[in-house]
Amino acid sequence: MDDDIAALVVDNGSGMCKAGFAGDDAPRAVFPSIVGRPRHQGVMVGMGQKDSYVGDEAQSKRCILTLKYPIERGIVTNWDDMEKIWHHTFYNELRVAPEEHPVLLTEAPLNPKANREKMTQIMFETFNTPAMYVAIQAVLSLYASGRTTGIVMDSGDGVTHTVPIYEGYALPHAILRLDLAGRDLTDYLMKILTERGYSFTTTAEREIVRDIKEKLCYVALDFEQEMATAASSSSLEKSYELPDGQVITIGNERFRCPEALFQPSFLGMESCGIHETTFNSIMKCDVDIRKDLYANTVLSGGTTMYPGIADRMQKEITALAPSTMKIKIIAPPERKYSVWIGGSILASLSTFQQMWISKQEYDESGPSIVHRKCF
């Protein structure tokens, strides 16, 4: 497909928005899902201050703005701001006219019906798209790994889901949601670094901690043993240079932070860890398909990028599952963007072209058409 008629693929996450053209192997635009508004009235006349900023620009001006995330825990909660993010995506990032391209959007598993209708309505009425489709994020990740059956553990910035999928269809009764993801881990790292005597409190400093987390954290195969190693030697210590030139040292925090994924009690949460949630999700499925799910457990999303996470999942699920069961954890290197990549694959398939909801169908049926055509 040429760019001039290529479908647009937009994956709206709680933390980052990924956008680009169907058929590409990576998103062209990746920016924070943030809308910022000035805290104070502009002092300098003629500076041409805008009433709102989106993405990286909002991030860089964060000291004078109030930042809002329109997507909370994977679900859109502020539609005015969401519209601003889409506008920014089309006109500033991709530089396309949305009325000339079909648009594939992604949604969280178990997204409320009213939300899908609202997305559909905004695309056709505000942006005048010729056609659109809404796909479930985890299903796209599975497609990106070249499968149609498996269980996806998708963990991003705002929310974690375990989604069993059989022959391309998500099984809603067995989907589980865990409100523990990247943002919570960043907050936890801020807290445990404070215990070491480093103070990180502001939203600007939170971004620094997020960078420390992404560069230095990893998942221990055996937490207790790793703690013992960290206590007895400095072999696990790493240093990090802050923007002001100060150098900080971080030791057991490197694996204590992501350990919260397996032990949510670290964050004061009573829920099960990601390994147990994945197991519970499999157990909610028909006994005949469990074997296929165990053998096709796919990790996706930025919060699954920690080194060591796949080995640890393998170990934990093996301990929970029947002893003869073959368990395979698939962690593709590009899993940070696998939702987007799956969307790019889907939207460029010739067999998918009849699946689009067209403007004409929308005009005839209204927003509820989305439930009949996207499942």
UniProtKB/Swiss-Prot annotation:
Top EC class of this enzyme: hydrolase
Catalysis performed (reactions): ATP + H2O = ADP + phosphate + H(+)
N-acetylaspartate modified-residue sites: 2
Positions carrying N-acetylmethionine: 1
Keywords linked to the UniProt accession: Acetylation, ATP-binding, Cytoplasm, Cytoskeleton, Hydrolase, Methylation, Nucleotide-binding, Nucleus, Oxidation, Ubl conjugation
Gene Ontology CC annotations of this record: actin cytoskeleton; cytoskeleton; dense body; focal adhesion; nucleus; plasma membrane; protein-containing complex
Predominant cellular place of this UniProt entry's protein: cytoplasm
Modification after translation: ISGylated. Oxidation of Met-44 and Met-47 by MICALs (MICAL1, MICAL2 or MICAL3) to form methionine sulfoxide promotes actin filament depolymerization. MICAL1 and MICAL2 produce the (R)-S-oxide form. The (R)-S-oxide form is reverted by MSRB1 and MSRB2, which promote actin repolymerization.
Record PTM N6-methyllysine, positions in chain: 84
Subcellular location: Cytoplasm, Cytoskeleton; Nucleus
Keyword hit for Nucleotide-binding: yes
Modified residues (Methionine (R)-sulfoxide): 44, 47
EC numbers: 3.6.4.-
GO MF annotation terms: ATP binding; hydrolase activity
One Pfam family, short name: Actin
Gene3D superfamilies: 3.30.420.40, Actin, Chain A, domain 4 (3.90.640.10)
InterPro entries: Actin (IPR004000), Actin/actin-like_CS (IPR020902), Actin_CS (IPR004001), ATPase_NBD (IPR043129)
Miscellaneous remark of the record: In vertebrates 3 main groups of actin isoforms, alpha, beta and gamma have been identified. The alpha actins are found in muscle tissues and are a major constituent of the contractile apparatus. The beta and gamma actins coexist in most cell types as components of the cytoskeleton and as mediators of internal cell motility.
Record function comment: Actin is a highly conserved protein that polymerizes to produce filaments that form cross-linked networks in the cytoplasm of cells. Actin exists in both monomeric (G-actin) and polymeric (F-actin) forms, both forms playing key functions, such as cell motility and contraction. In addition to their role in the cytoplasmic cytoskeleton, G- and F-actin also localize in the nucleus, and regulate gene transcription and motility and repair of damaged DNA.
Entry similarity comment: Belongs to the actin family.
Subunit structure: Polymerization of globular actin (G-actin) leads to a structural filament (F-actin) in the form of a two-stranded helix. Each actin can bind to 4 others. Identified in a IGF2BP1-dependent mRNP granule complex containing untranslated mRNAs. Component of the BAF complex, which includes at least actin (ACTB), ARID1A, ARID1B/BAF250, SMARCA2, SMARCA4/BRG1, ACTL6A/BAF53, ACTL6B/BAF53B, SMARCE1/BAF57 SMARCC1/BAF155, SMARCC2/BAF170, SMARCB1/SNF5/INI1, and one or more of SMARCD1/BAF60A, SMARCD2/BAF60B, or SMARCD3/BAF60C. In muscle cells, the BAF complex also contains DPF3.
The protein, known as: Actin, cytoplasmic 1
Organism: Camelus dromedarius (Dromedary)
